Design a protein with these regions (language model features):
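Short beta-strands and strand-loop turn motifs
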Residues: 41, 186-187
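Conserved catalytic motifs of ABC-family nucleotide-binding domains
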Residues: 183
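Short strand-turn-strand beta-turns centered on an Asx-Gly dipeptide
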Residues: 189-194, 220
Length: 243
C-alpha cells in the first residue's frame, strides 16, 4: 500500500511512501552532465500492455515554453513514450536514472519521436523538499513576465533578446515594494543572467523566501539595481488520495 507524502502540481511530481523493506532502489545520475546524442532507455507500461523498455537518444536539453508545467527544464528524447509511460524512469546506458518521463508531443495519441522527461536534478530538489516540508517552498516576487521578442528588443533599442520584460506587478508584492515597474527589463538575478521569462521564473523559484535578491534591470535605456526581499510563492492546491 502506497501513501502520498506530498505532491507538487507545478512540476507534476509526487512522493509516495511504500511500507515495505528490502526493495531495490534505482540509482541517480547527474542530469546536468547529460549530452545531446547520449543513449537513453524509457521504462513504463504503455497502453497497459505490461512493463516495456524503449531506446533512443537525448534529442535536446533544457526545453521550455511547452505549456506542460509551470516550471520547465525538460530533457527531450526520441525514445518511444506513450500513454502509460508517464512517471516511469528515463535511464542512461548504465541503468542510472536521468529523468522521469512526463509527456509527449503527438497529434495521434501515440509516440511521434518527441518525448519529454523531467531531469533528475529537479526531481531530487522537489523530492527532498516534499519529504522535509510536505510540499515545495519556492521564492516569489509577484511579477508577470514575458519573453523579449526581436520586435520588442528593437523597440527598446536592445542588441539581443536576452532578459525578461515585466508585463505586470502585483500591488504591494515584493517587486512592487522594491520599486520595479511594468516595462522594466530584468537582466540578472544575483549576478545570474536571464535569457528568457522561463529562466527568470526558475531563478526566482530557487530563491529562499526571506532573503534579499539583487536584481539588475533596464529602464529607459539605463541600467539600475533593485533589492527585492523574496516572499513565499503561493501554493497550488491539488488533492491526492492514497493508492
Amino acid at each position: 500500500m502506497a501513501r502520498v507524502v506530498g505532491s507538487d502540481p507545478e512540476t507534476d511530481l509526487a512522493v509516495l511512501k511504500v511500507n515495505l523493506t528490502g526493495l531495490p532502489a534505482i540509482t541517480f545520475t547527474q542530469s546536468d552532465k547529460a549530452n545531446v546524442g547520449d543513449i537513453v532507455l524509457a521504462i513504463g507500461d504503455p497502453f497497459g500492455v505490461g512493463q516495456t523498455v524503449t531506446m533512443g537518444i537525448i534529442s535536446a536539453l533544457g526545453r521550455t515554453h511547452l505549456g506542460i508545467n509551470t516550471f520547465e527544464n525538460f530533457i527531450q528524447t526520441d525514445a518511444a513514450i506513450n500513454p502509460g509511460n508517464s512517471g516511469g524512469p528515463l535511464v542512461d546506458a548504465n541503468g542510472n536514472m536521468i529523468g522521469i518521463n512526463s509527456a509527449i508531443y503527438t497529434r495521434t495519441g501515440g509516440s511521434q519521436g518527441i518525448g519529454f522527461a523531467i531531469p533528475v536534478s529537479l526531481v531530487v530538489q522537489v523530492m527532498d523538499q516534499i519529504i522535509k516540508h510536505g510540499s515545495v517552498i519556492r521564492g516569489w516576487m509577484g511579477v508577470e513576465v514575458q519573453d523579449m521578442t526581436p520586435e520588442l528588443a528593437e523597440s527598446f533599442k536592445l542588441k539581443d533578446t536576452n532578459g525578461a520584460l515585466i508585463a505586470g506587478i502585483l500591488k504591494g508584492g515584493p517587486a512592487d515594494r522594491a520599486g520595479i515597474r511594468p516595462g522594466d527589463i530584468l537582466v540578472s538575478v544575483n549576478d545570474k543572467n536571464i535569457t528568457d521569462s522561463s529562466g527568470l521564473l526558475n531563478l526566482i523559484a530557487m530563491l529562499v523566501p526571506g532573503q534579499t535578491a539583487q536584481i539588475k534591470l533596464l529602464r529607459n535605456d539605463k541600467a539600475m539595481l533593485a533589492a527585492v526581499k523574496v516572499d513565499t510563492r503561493p501554493r497550488i492546491q491539488q488533492p491526492l488520495t492514497d493508492q
